Amino acid sequence: MDLPPTNDFCADPTVALRQRMVKQQIIARGVNDPAVLAALQQVPRHRFVPDSLQNLAYADQPLTIGYGQTISQPYIVAYMTEAAHLTPSSKVLEIGTGCGYQAAILAEIAQEVFTVEVVPELARQARDRLEALGYQNIHYKIGDGYQGWSEFAPYDAILVTAAPDHRPQPLLQQLAVGGHLVIPVGTVGQRLEVLHKTSTDLEMEKAIAVRFVPLQGHSYGF
């Protein structure tokens, strides 16, 4: 599969690393949405990784970012983004801003991204980083992700980047009819669920085994 055009390799040596990441880690494992591939190729993942882990910025593994949190491996970011079925007009809610990498990927595709982070310092760092990269379609909130962000609901897609042991009811309520919820659920044996909301039901489209950090928040008991 051909990749979409990207920036000049000479101007940014990490472009080649992103090209290789997308070909070897993303396309090779079945993610093929052109918008998702273009976003992963465009966003400089190394800008979201601690200085001490720069040599692993484009490796196929999660990395610690402090405060007990991680940046997900590139494949999981791609899988979740593709599963959300985004369009250029989508309004997306992300639970767990973390370092901001997933928010950047979403912002490359969707019209608006609303992201909630419970750890104030992570939220501030992510906002500074994303604004420095020029993103103007991301809205930020420091708060309890379990409760979502009802002010701007409903959302066409909701992505959760930490695992509760059950599906948070507020998120189900804030998902638009026709929208997708992508969420890891469980404690020891987690699965990443892709749920589609219809006018009468919530349908499971697919699920894979995963391991995410636990969801934190006052409503959740952490």
From Swiss-Prot:
It catalyses: [protein]-L-isoaspartate + S-adenosyl-L-methionine = [protein]-L-isoaspartate alpha-methyl ester + S-adenosyl-L-homocysteine. Its EC number is 2.1.1.77. The active site is at S72. Keywords: Cytoplasm, Methyltransferase, S-adenosyl-L-methionine, Transferase. One of its GO terms (cellular component) is cytoplasm. It holds the Pfam family PCMT. SUPFAM superfamilies: S-adenosyl-L-methionine-dependent methyltransferases. GO terms for molecular function: protein-L-isoaspartate (D-aspartate) O-methyltransferase activity. InterPro entries: PCMT, SAM-dependent_MTases_sf. GO terms for biological process: methylation; protein modification process; protein repair. It comes from the Bacteria. It is found in: Cytoplasm. Catalyzes the methyl esterification of L-isoaspartyl residues in peptides and proteins that result from spontaneous decomposition of normal L-aspartyl and L-asparaginyl residues. It plays a role in the repair and/or degradation of damaged proteins. Belongs to the methyltransferase superfamily. L-isoaspartyl/D-aspartyl protein methyltransferase family. HAMAP family: PIMT (MF_00090). NCBIfam families: pimt, PRK00312.1. This is Protein-L-isoaspartate O-methyltransferase.
